[in-house]
Amino acid sequence: MNTWMNFNLQNSNSPLMEQLMFFHNHSMLIILLITILVGYIMSSLLYNKLYNRYLLESQNVEIIWTILPAFMLIFIALPSLRLLYLLDDSNSPLISLKAIGHQWYWSYEYTDFNNISFDSYMIPSNELNLNSFRLLDVDNRIILPINSQIRILITATDVLHSWTIPSLGIKIDATPGRLNQSNFMMNRPGLYFGQCSEICGANHSFMPIVIESILINSFIKWISSNS
């Protein structure tokens, strides 16, 4: 989860988020090099007294300032395209979970099993325990196994919402009348927190999401006890 004064991305807990962080670092390095180069050229033009009265056009200069940005864009575009394909890749999911956005709570359905569905509301501040997180904890958590491919189907019943778990690299719009899909896998057990990331009304800030990832044996026991 996010912490106080954290200006970086959250720790990655899925292979997809790990790749997104690699791409972020890669693109930031290229942006930094571009900033240094442009800053050096601008400062050189401002502070030196060199000039050329006879330089009206230069084929070489035009070739350089056309090819150099093109190469930089290619180095950014190729990893980006690979990530876009990974985001849409559906690789034989083990479990399908359906998330439905409402004003202002989420409801979930485990479509592979019978009669497993529930609503998930934020726990009010006056009902929190000492070890709970304000505006992030819910009364019913999503229970999912680790190291398993999960397919998430997302829709809404009223207005636009957005189902987001930053540490897993997931952000999918929940649109009324439309079913969106994504895939993810969690590397380690724990709690993963997220929130609705689309302004959806007065209580938009009070739509948290909590995933509890557990071992596959514990997940089977949970399914058996709730079926």
Curated annotation (Swiss-Prot):
Cu cation A2 binds at C196, E198, C200, H204. It is found in: Mitochondrion inner membrane. One of its GO terms (cellular component) is mitochondrial inner membrane. Its cofactor is Cu cation. It comes from Ctenocephalides felis (Cat flea). This is Cytochrome c oxidase subunit 2. The gene is COII. Its EC number is 7.1.1.9. Mg(2+) binds at E198.
